[in-house]
């Protein structure tokens, strides 16, 4: 299981949109108090679930899965039904899809926090 950044709230036990909203409000108050005025950038990944590359997703998941049986099962979850949904994308509504999407974007989160060193970074998925 990947280590999500502290400000990740989607599909994580005892988190969610309400806690995310409270977290953001609290962080904005701290930022305003310490730094004054600031800008907020709100982005959305258009048709995100429909554009997830299943090969990339599977590669990411395999970093966290050691058991060969579980890898095969995960591969089935991702690739079975490709004839219905096409070459890219994962089904919307499946809990596994929501969790997989969180893991998929965790790569971006880690890059933004660890490589770019963005101090105040927040996202909500799902």
Stretches found by the model and what they are:
Residues 10-20:
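Long, hydrophobic, well-ordered secondary-structure blocks that form the structural core
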Residues 1-9:
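Electropositive, glycine- and tryptophan-enriched low-complexity nucleic-acid-binding patches
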């Amino acid at each position: 299981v990947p280590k999500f950044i502290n400000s990740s709230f989607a599909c994580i036990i005892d988190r969610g949109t309400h806690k995310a909203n409270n977290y953001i409000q609290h962080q904005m108050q701290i930022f305003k108090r310490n730094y004054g005025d600031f800008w907020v950038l709100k982005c959305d990944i258009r048709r995100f679930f429909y554009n997830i590359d299943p090969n990339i997703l599977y590669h990411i998941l395999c970093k966290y899965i050691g058991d060969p049986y579980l890898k095969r099962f995960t591969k089935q979850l991702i690739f079975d039904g490709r004839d219905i949904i096409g070459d890219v994308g994962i089904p919307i509504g499946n809990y596994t899809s929501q969790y997989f999407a969180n893991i998929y974007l965790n790569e971006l989160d880690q890059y933004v926090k660890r490589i770019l060193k963005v101090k105040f970074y927040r996202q909500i998925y799902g």
